[in-house]
Design a protein with these regions (language model features):
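N-terminal-proximal low-complexity accessory segments that begin disordered
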Residues: 1-19
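Phosphate/anion-contacting hairpin/loop surfaces
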Residues: 14-203
Length: 203
């Protein structure tokens, strides 16, 4: 854990080795494979030590995206010092300033710890503290891109103000769409983001 809000996890798959980067940074939260090396602090942070304890010899059983939200869950299975199977979810929430990385015990549903501890003084609806039950971020009421049809798309983005600001309308209307992704979608659709009603939208 080279900084307070980012992690590197080494993954072994047969003879292959992968390095997974996780970030809960406000400006560049994300998850991706990398070959980047980084200098680590002399004394590992507490969250890093906890992950080493629970994940160092664990097997990855599943990696999934929650619905079409920007939430990724890495489900693991390990054996503790008593020989019992222990299952965890490493949850990466990619949500701008609300981004977080949490380790949750699957059986109890409780948070073992997280990279950003949020108390009730900061967020009354949702606290992320060790020992509390994990509560998923509230739904934003957006339409899933898995459920999109041309009719639903036109209705959703029109209601979200596509004519005034296409990029913001896509982000507001469709779950899992970031501002960068919205800009790329518009560019690929029309070759430009300047036309507020692209040919693809009118069609």
């Amino acid at each position: 854990q080279p900084s307070p809000d980012e992690l590197f996890i080494n993954i072994h798959c047969g003879r292959e080795k992968y390095r997974l980067y996780l970030s809960a940074n406000t400006n560049h939260a994300g998850v991706y494979l990398t070959e980047e090396k980084s200098a680590n602090p002399q004394n590992p942070p507490g969250f890093c030590m906890l992950l080493r304890k629970h994940l160092q010899s664990a097997r990855i059983r599943e990696i999934r995206q929650v619905d079409s939200e920007r939430i990724i869950e890495i489900c693991t299975d390990a054996t503790n010092e008593l020989g019992f199977s222990v299952k965890h979810r490493l949850i990466i929430e990619i949500m701008g300033r609300h981004s977080n990385i949490l380790l949750v015990d699957i059986e109890s549903g409780k948070i073992a710890d997280c990279i950003k501890r949020i108390s009730g003084d900061v967020n009354r609806y949702r606290q992320t503290l060790p020992g509390l039950l994990y509560v998923a971020p509230p739904s934003q009421g957006k339409i899933s891109y898995f459920d999109l049809t041309p009719e639903k798309y036109r209705e959703a983005v029109t209601a979200a103000g596509f004519a005034d600001n296409p990029e913001k309308a896509l982000v507001r209307a469709i779950s899992g769409i970031s501002p960068v992704m919205a800009a790329e979608i518009l560019f690929c659709a029309a070759g430009s983001r300047e036309d507020p009603l692209s040919a693809s939208y009118r069609e």
